Every structure is written in structure tokens, then in C-alpha cells.
Amino acid sequence: MSPMARKPLIAGNWKMNLDHQQAIGTVQKLAFALHKDYYEKVDVAVIVPFTDLRSVQTLVEGDKLQITYGAQDVSQHESGAYTGEVSASMLAKLNCSWVVVGHSERREYHNETDELVAAKAKAALSKGISPIVCVGEPLEIREAGTHVDYVVEQTRASLAGLSADELANTVIAYEPVWAIGTGKVASAADAQEVCKAIRGLVTELAGEEVAEGMRILYGGSVKAETIAEIVSQPDVDGGLVGGASLDGEAFAKLAANAANAV
């Protein structure tokens, strides 16, 4: 598969924002503002709080929207006495296409390890949901100049135990921790450097065909003004967007800018 065949994914991670009523309005605005022709060039997803999923599902399916949706976390367990956890089978019942695993905020605030992230990714894949596996270096690693090796090894550990077929249904998001919510943005060249190295790792793990088909996103203060240069990089296949996805019309503009750049 040539790199040109990878359709960019623009995924909006709402984090802990927007209740289920606000979610309906936001997705309606996004759908209204983004002309249907753009979906031929980019896939657009919203990654929403658990409490919003059923409302978003009802809207997307009822209005036959081309937007896809997913969750921000999943349990590694199938079911049982795990208070507060949500299983992959529950998300599958809601027709989730995606689930983010290993976001830097989960790694930092909930002490999630690479091993746990890999288990969550495998749980999602077992129910037909594509995990968006997040990796990225803190500022001190970037300043030391060891960021490429750090991220490659973090990615290797976060994909441990996944087969080539499973990796073919996995998305990776490179999100330098120092650029998340800080307004600092890695340059497009920075993003390309690391995403290319991640693709090299996937070639090693699963072969060239899987690696060439895998979508690798950049996340970290992505905005409408910066997305075009980011997705123009040969190994960057979209964006994991934070704050810029909370306004439906603004997120539509960002997605349109990405579509126009490919």
C-alpha cells in the first residue's frame, strides 16, 4: 500500500468536557458545517466521555452521519467485580469504532503502564474496536535528544502481544507530553521524525504491508492553522485533536483544512 492510500484520521478527544446534551449540539454543528465531500478525503471521529456515547450513537445512526465515534478509555477486563470500569464489549454494543488507550493523562494521573496499555488495546481489538494507542516523550527526554529511542521503545512495549492482524487494525498517536494543552507545538518536522521511526518499528514487528497501511497521528495542541502542514508529512496520517475539537464549527474547519491538504 502506498502512503497516498492512507486516509487521514482527524479525531477529536473531548477529554472530560461536554455532557450528553452538549454532545448532541456539538456533533450536529460539526455535521452541518463539514460538507459531505470532505469525508472522501479524511475520516472524522469524536472521542467522547462514556456518558455521551449513547446520545452520539443515536444521533449518528439516526441521521446517518459520516462521523465516527469512540471512547477515551476501556478496561482490560471482560467483566466482573471491577467497580467503575467499562468493558470493550459494552463499547462494542454502542458501535464504537475507536477507543483511546494510554493517553498521557491516563499514564500520568492513573499510573498506567505500557503493559496495561497493551492489555487494553488487545481487549478493544477482541471486540472489533480499533485502539488509538498514545505514546510520547516528556520535556526532559526531548531536551536530552533521546526522544526517538524513548518513543520507539515505549511504542514497542505498548503494542506487546499484538499480532500482525491486530496491528493492522490499530492506530498510533504520537503526542509529545510537553505539547499537550500547553500551546507548545512540535514542528511538523518533529512530528515526521518520530512518526517515521514508529512506522519503522511496526515494519519490524508486523512487516512492511501492515506498517504502510497503519495510520499514525500527531497529537499536541493541534489547531486549524497547523493541521495542514502536519498531515502533509509523509508519515503523519492525521491528528488527535484536543481543545480545538470542543466547538463543532471550529473542528469542522480543522477537518476541512486537513482534507484540503491531502
Swiss-Prot record:
This is Triosephosphate isomerase. InterPro entries: Aldolase_TIM, TIM_sf, TrioseP_Isoase_bac/euk, Triosephosphate_isomerase, Triosephosphate_isomerase_AS. HAMAP family: TIM_B. The gene is tpiA. GO terms for molecular function: triose-phosphate isomerase activity. The keyword Isomerase applies. It holds the Pfam family TIM. Its main location: cytoplasm. Pathway: Carbohydrate biosynthesis; gluconeogenesis; Carbohydrate degradation; glycolysis; D-glyceraldehyde 3-phosphate from glycerone phosphate: step 1/1. Involved in the gluconeogenesis. Catalyzes stereospecifically the conversion of dihydroxyacetone phosphate (DHAP) to D-glyceraldehyde-3-phosphate (G3P). It comes from the Bacteria. GO terms for cellular component: cytosol. Homodimer. PROSITE patterns: TIM_1 (PS00171), TIM_2 (PS51440).
